[in-house]
Amino acid sequence: MADGKAGEEKPEKPQRAGAAGGPEEEAEKPVKTKTVSSSNGGESSSRSAEKRSAEDEAADLPTKPTKMSKFGFAIGSQTARKASAISIRLGASKPKETVPTLAPKTLSVAAAFNEDEDSEPEEMPPEAKMRMKNIGRDTPTSAGPNSFNKGKHGFSDNQKLWERNIKSHLGNVHDQDN
């Protein structure tokens, strides 16, 4: 029954003298197998025998090479065309180049930005004015290269703050004693 299975192909293996024909030898050569199902008599359920035979015949036919268009360069014909496009004539008059005339400027910068119509200055909200002014040590923003260790109320010197706190505590203790 093993010889009569339909759809199974076994390639012939040449036996070497002294070779056992182990799994290493089998791994070197690809083996084509097709799945065999016992329910439908050895045929695959998705493909019929007719479809398989048609595909095998199509695979056996030699395929025609695709037609490629000829690709080449015709040097002689191209040089003749380009030579007529560029020609140098000695003693010929040069064509005069026209200088483009510029239109006279009628609009000024003020007219472009409508400065004349807007006579009163823009009003800024007070928050924006506050940010633009430097209010001494009470600057709300501390940004820039020279603003290291600067808080909302100016630069914070920890030594000076410690001295101030000690003096205020001593003053409070001295006042409490009296």
Swiss-Prot record:
Keywords: Acetylation, Cell cycle, Nucleus, Phosphoprotein, Ubl conjugation. The modification Phosphothreonine is found at residue 139. Residues 1-82, 134-158 are annotated as: Disordered. Ubiquitinated; mediated by UHRF2 and leading to its subsequent proteasomal degradation. The modification Phosphoserine is found at residues 53, 77, 87, 119, 147. The modification N-acetylalanine is found at residue 2. Its main location: nucleus. It comes from the Eukaryota. The modification N6-acetyllysine is found at residues 64, 150, 152. It is found in: Nucleus. Residues 1-15 have a biased composition (Basic and acidic residues). GO terms for biological process: proteasome-mediated ubiquitin-dependent protein catabolic process; protein ubiquitination. GO terms for cellular component: nucleus. Pfam families: PCNP. Residues 37-47 have a biased composition (Low complexity). Residues 139-149 have a biased composition (Polar residues). May be involved in cell cycle regulation. Interacts with UHRF2/NIRF. This is PEST proteolytic signal-containing nuclear protein. It comes from Mus musculus.
